[in-house]
Amino acid sequence: MSSEAETQPPAAPVPAAPAAAPADSKPNGGSGNGSSGLASAAPPAGGDKKVIATKVLGTVKWFNVRNGYGFINRNDTKEDVFVHQTAIKKNNPRKYLRSVGDGETVEFDVVEGEKGAEAANVTGPGGVPVQGSKYAADRNHYRRYPRRRGPPRNYQQNYQNSESGEKNEGAENIPEGQAQQRRPYRRRRYPPYYMRRPYGRRPQYSNPPVQGEIVEGADNQGAGEQGRPVRQNMYRGYRPRFRRGPPRQRQPREDGNEEDKENQGDETQGQQPPQRRYRRNFNYRRRRPENPKPQDGKETKTAEPPAENTSAPEAEQGGAE
């Protein structure tokens, strides 16, 4: 038993000998040991081929990215070695296709091919990835940015969401978190075309409480009034268009109402619908100076009908008597 225990330890280092053998046999070019070393180098070269030299430095003479092949000039022997894109082991991660740049220094293994020497396991000096050809397409790492720019296109939605922010611009007691959320909306208002559309529409809805002199429905208190004079100055061009049309409609209506008052006794019912219409039309700011005139006329109109109404029953009583 003691003899068997002594014989077993020397048996362990025996398998280590073949592992060291390939390293020594590679430079000698042994056929049997070289095949085991080519196991890793053969697949990119496209088959089991003899290795002529390893870790050879050379400069790329030219490389066609479209066809996927080129030639490398060895620095030691000044020979041209054929290179295929499949032989490139470490490609530039930013490039789609495997390629080598013209005039680039490359480290590779020389292998025997069908028509001559070929390169295999092509990498940069020291095993670094290859730089690649400048004509090779880069990977589109910037695809995400145009997708981020997409949301600002919906300016109308942004303005609808930011209307509440404009109403409260004058409020001083605002937490910092809300103020930061409103800043991007302000930045998106810079394009002029998108500024004109919402502001041109807003005065129609925001003005009625001011011109109709109804303060109960006014939601915009301090901040809304501060923003209105600015909008008036910015959009003066829109006013004359609205001034021309509605005043022409007023005059015939007022004249017709005066004639009806003289000829008809029950005029109060007919005057109520036009008053509502006028109030709707007065929503525009342009008609502020014109508001007192129709109001005086309305007061005289409302004062006249009761006199006629009182005369009418007196006449009826006289006829009855």
UniProtKB/Swiss-Prot annotation:
CDD domains: CSP_CDS (cd04458). Its main location: cytoplasm. Keywords: Cytoplasm, DNA-binding, mRNA processing, mRNA splicing, Nucleus, Repressor, RNA-binding, Secreted, Transcription, Transcription regulation. Residues 1-47, 117-321 are annotated as: Disordered. InterPro entries: Cold_shock_domain, CSD, CSD_CS, CSP_DNA-bd, NA-bd_OB-fold. It is found in: Cytoplasm; Nucleus; Cytoplasmic granule; Secreted. SUPFAM superfamilies: Nucleic acid-binding proteins. This is Y-box-binding protein 1. It comes from Gallus gallus (Chicken). The lineage of its organism: Eukaryota, Metazoa, Chordata, Craniata, Vertebrata. The gene is YBX1.
